[in-house]
Design a protein with these regions (language model features):
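Polybasic, lysine-rich low-complexity intrinsically disordered segments
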Residues: 7-8
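Phosphate-end processing signature that detects enzymes handling 5′-triphosphorylated RNA
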Residues: 13-215
Length: 215
């Protein structure tokens, strides 16, 4: 069966959204994502549909306080690095989706913050303070590396990920949408058309921490 992606190939942008540094996500925006874990053969099948997309390597460094205050308050923070730039992101759960706060960083500055286990002044620290988190000490938990294929489709921004952390490799499909209910229906239809069985996908941070505890 021809998938929704294949049917709408003329409407796709055949390059990763992260290839263009001018397309950095808004400093603050509501992220509504649908996702499923994939088997390796399902991942390979879907990758064939991302024709012309250049994959982007991104490294996610997860950060918390030494006593895991962020995890306790159910917020997540990371520095994500790309080939020549980086960003600091805070995710705060909402009734639907996560509110994201993003600060663009120069790659060298990001590397310095990571080596010193520190974070820069700005939007993210200000938002943390609103949640009662004003730590002077930070801890880099480790790194999860993702090879991402990303493109805009008729049903939303789709990302196909292969992630590695500790001794784990997993595969995941994400769809970022504007409307949760409509997006959920279209995502399910896409999975059915591609004969993919839905597997609940905890966040990358949750998967990372679980493996960290078991390592």
């Amino acid at each position: 069966m021809i998938s929704r992606v294949q049917k709408t190939v003329s409407s796709l942008y055949h390059k990763s959204a992260f290839n263009d540094k001018e397309k950095v996500r808004k400093m603050k925006h509501l992220e509504i994502e649908l996702k499923t874990l994939l088997k390796k053969d399902e991942y390979d099948h879907l990758k064939d549909q991302f024709t012309g997309v250049t994959p982007v390597l991104q490294k996610n460094y997860y950060i918390d306080t030494p006593d895991f205050e962020l995890r306790e308050k159910k917020v997540a923070m990371r520095i994500r690095t790309f080939e020549d730039w980086a960003e600091l992101t805070l995710k705060v759960p909402q009734s639907v989706g996560n509110m994201e706060y993003n600060q663009k960083l120069h790659l060298k500055d990001a590397e310095d913050y990571l080596s010193k286990e520190d974070i820069p002044q700005g939007l993210v620290l200000a938002e943390l303070a609103k949640h009662g988190i004003q730590s002077k000490k930070w801890q880099v938990l480790g790194c999860l590396t993702t090879l991402r294929y990303e493109m805009q489709t008729a049903i939303g921004l789709m990302a196909l990920d292969e992630s590695q952390y500790f001794d784990m490799t997993d595969y995941e499909l994400e769809l970022e949408v504007e409307n949760h209910e409509q997006g959920k229906q279209e995502f399910q239809q896409f999975l059915e058309e591609n004969q993919i069985s839905y597997q609940k996908a905890p966040s990358k941070l949750v998967r990372f921490v679980k493996s960290m505890k078991n390592s």
